[in-house]
Regions:
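Negatively charged
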Residues: 2-120
Length: 120
């Protein structure tokens, strides 16, 4: 699923609730460059086997909030640039994020100038 929607600059909303992601290990840069994306539903993503999440939301500058509290990050080793330049992002729930195995979180929140709180 790496780069799956990369550069889809006209994409405004996306519902991927029915995607089967049980065996996916790499979701890096999946939505990178989707600068018009305002609504994203990935609430049912199974991320149990994911190791690479780097840049998944990189450049999603129109997203204001989304909930990742069902994301299982136990096996993730790379989260670099995950929310890079998500300049409209105001709230983010990362309460369930386990970063014990993460080696790279560089620039994870770079350019998130509107981010005000971590929903708890």
């Amino acid at each position: 699923m790496y780069n799956m929607f990369y550069g889809c600059t006209s994409l405004k909303e996306l519902n991927l609730n029915n995607f089967n992601t049980n065996n996916v290990t790499n979701i890096g840069y999946m939505f990178s460059g989707c600068s018009s994306l305002k609504e994203l539903n990935i609430n049912n993503f199974n991320t149990n086997n994911v190791k690479y999440m780097g840049g998944i939301f990189n450049g999603c500058s129109s997203l204001k909030e989304f909930n990742l509290n069902k994301f299982n990050t136990n096996n993730v080793t790379d989260m670099n640039c995950m929310f890079f330049e998500c300049s409209s992002l105001k709230e983010l729930n990362l309460n369930n994020f386990n970063t014990n195995n993460v080696n790279d979180m560089g620039c994870m929140f770079h350019g998130c100038s509107s981010l005000k709180k971590n929903k708890s």
